[in-house]
A protein has these predicted regions:
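N-terminal membrane-targeting hydrophobic helices
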Residues: 1-146
Length: 146
């Protein structure tokens, strides 16, 4: 899934957790389970960057509406950390993706299977957009109560 959905799932996990450390650890682990949902491309790289960038700004706004904005920013980082490590490592250094859930190599690999691989559900472009936008707007709506 895209970073917007991972971030909202992480924020909800942190909000429901008994303490921030447990919440952030669970937000990190959630990434691998969320990747069982196979997203579809939401457009060209430029279109995806505009959509995800806009959703990230809405997420940041929602964070500042909460009683603890830095905790929810940390939740976004924790829930996206596998991709934040892998993507730049692959793009800049040409290294294979260690955490990638969309291949059979890397972290948690056992006989070609791993957390998040292979995907269990494949979403269409419209479903992917709906989940990303809808979850971010949901977080914006509930942020005042966190």
């Amino acid at each position: 899934m895209y970073s917007s959905f991972h971030g909202v799932v992480g924020a909800i996990i942190v909000a429901a957790s008994p303490d921030p450390i447990t919440g952030l650890a669970l937000a990190f682990v959630s990434h691998f389970f969320i990747d069982y949902i196979g997203e579809s491309s939401i457009g060209t790289l430029k279109e995806a960057a505009i959509i995800e960038g806009g959703l990230f700004l809405v997420y940041l706004l929602a964070c500042y509406l909460t009683s603890n904005p830095w905790l929810y920013i940390a939740a976004w980082v924790a829930s996206n950390l596998p991709d934040l490590i892998d993507k730049p490592n692959r793009i800049i250094r040409g290294k294979p993706e260690w955490f990638s859930c969309h291949n059979g190599e890397g972290f948690f690999n056992y006989k070609g299977r791993k957390l998040g691989y292979p995907t269990l559900v494949q979403l269409t472009k419209e479903q992917t957009l709906t989940i990303n936008i809808g979850s971010t707007l949901y977080f914006l709506l509930i942020a005042c109560f966190l």
